[in-house]
């Protein structure tokens, strides 16, 4: 759905805006140099009664004697620039008449990333992004009661990058040794391996270009039916979106040498080639992908106030969605929704909502789910007894709601009400025979088992809240308590043992979970003068979730491996807090801890320097 600003009545207005930005990491780890690194290694050898091995290298590295043989490489600096940059130019044209209003926006965006490149190479593996955006909105009044709107937008984007993972490049740069070999020898050779020489990994392995395009369209027609009754409207919406992307990968690799062992009498580096590279760039098309989405919606709405006190509104909506991403079958959903609300004298509010949603993921007769909800509210600040406090308490509202929502996205599995039959290559070894089992044949095997009674996952949600405004809106406070209970969670029936003969674990609507908590939001807005406005906003949230029912193996139930009764994603295992110090011990020699420090039952004798673990369940021991 496209929802952007609309054109306004008036002469054409043209706005051009140019922006430039430079970005850089706020903080990077500081690494010791090669000489200090080797000195620490020598110190470890000395402390363990061994002879140091880097004494000569340390002296020559500090003296910058021969950077080829005694390098000192900051690998993060070698693969990255000081900053990245981006530029954007936007042109906005809008205007219109009482009958036709329009808005047109076009933008060009360029970005250059932080990765370095080898300027001696004709090709560039550094990160670059170029995007062209266009969006137009038109409002056409076909009659005094008929409004046609259409929005069309899209973009073209080209992204250039290295063929390697950027995160992996930096991960390796962070932990690479600074003294083994330089990023590149002064004579041009590259030492190490494709993985250990991070500079080569970032700059010598080729490049890839990804092109993407997207078009979004939305058409709506709204008819005011006030000639039937005031406040009645009907609206139809049609949307069509399309997205496509593809990547061309041009891979290569350089000749790789072992680290130089010295220099000849003529002063040349003594290098031996370890691996031959490639003199050409490969060509591979990857990542070709596209999606298509169709959306239709019809809405009947009503909004009217009777006798200045009785505000009544309602809405009925039907929608259908079709989403195709090139799989065997597209995704389809459809449903209805409704809302009815009543407000008396601007103070007492009641609302009822429902959703009647359908999903292809369920069998016939079970595809639709009905999910109602209701809410009530009381605007206390509108009461007559609150008027003397109006300047201080500008708003006080109490509200409560309860309702249901449904989920048909069942762990990404489609049509789980049907059994599947798979090629045995996927689930079982094929049948082998002959000399050294050299002959084989695939067969068919049972895949996923059907869940004929599969139904919607349901969430019951309850909420009570307070909204408080002070000093004519200068302070706005919201407080909410919420409680969510989820049931019919689709999960594997892990209590069924393997000996039952299932190739894959059966699934079912079995699980239950609860989520409870509170949220506080505070906004402070102050206009000091016409040139100074200050706004502060803060949010504090506390939430606790717990698995209340989960089908688990019999060997797990009742043990510390059980997930029932714990938050989802609960960490398992020990959590390191810090290292023990002398101050933690009542008797260092005996390994006796001071009172109040949890004992670690799995260690025969503790010493300063051992890892101190967190007592997660507060039982006074780590076991």
List where the protein language model places each region.
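C-terminal beta-signal and adjacent terminal beta-strands/loops
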Residues: 24-31, 35-39, 79-80, 391-394, ...
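Hydrophobic transmembrane signal anchors and adjacent membrane-proximal interface regions, especially
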Residues: 56, 121, 127, 232, ...
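Extracellular/periplasmic, surface-exposed regions of secreted and cell-surface proteins
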Residues: 83, 137-146, 152-156, 161-167, ...
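Flexible glycine-rich, low-complexity coil/linker segments exposed to the extracellular/periplasmic environment
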Residues: 28-76, 175-203, 248-292, 423-449, ...
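Membrane-proximal, glycine/serine-rich, low-complexity loop/turn segments characteristic
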Residues: 1-212, 220-226, 410-428, 554-559, ...
